[in-house]
């Protein structure tokens, strides 16, 4: 399924992880306001969809790859994964996690 593949890509593509994912997680690490968290997370997800489409030559535009519901579910999945690092979700990942 696309959201799981995109989540795996976020965590395992070194270039994307270092340039976009990790800085986003650093920004939201101590944030408690959900709107601020989503304000950082959703643009990072959009960048990832673009990166994913370009890297794997996906014949869809990034905005057509996932519905807004799937993007929201992916955002929740990312946050859950970051907050519960001992629970392996879909991918093996580096150890920097939100506590």
Model-found features: residue ranges?
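Acidic interaction surfaces
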Residues: 1-99
């Amino acid at each position: 399924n696309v959201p799981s593949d995109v989540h795996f890509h976020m965590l395992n593509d070194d270039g994307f992880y270092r340039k976009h994912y990790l800085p986003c997680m650093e920004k939201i690490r101590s944030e408690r306001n959900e709107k601020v968290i989503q304000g950082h997370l959703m643009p990072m997800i959009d960048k990832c969809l673009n990166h994913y489409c370009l890297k794997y030559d996906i014949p869809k535009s990034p905005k057509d790859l996932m519905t807004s519901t799937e993007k929201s579910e992916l955002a929740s999945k990312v946050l859950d994964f970051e907050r519960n690092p001992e629970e392996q979700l879909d991918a093996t990942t580096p150890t920097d996690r939100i506590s």
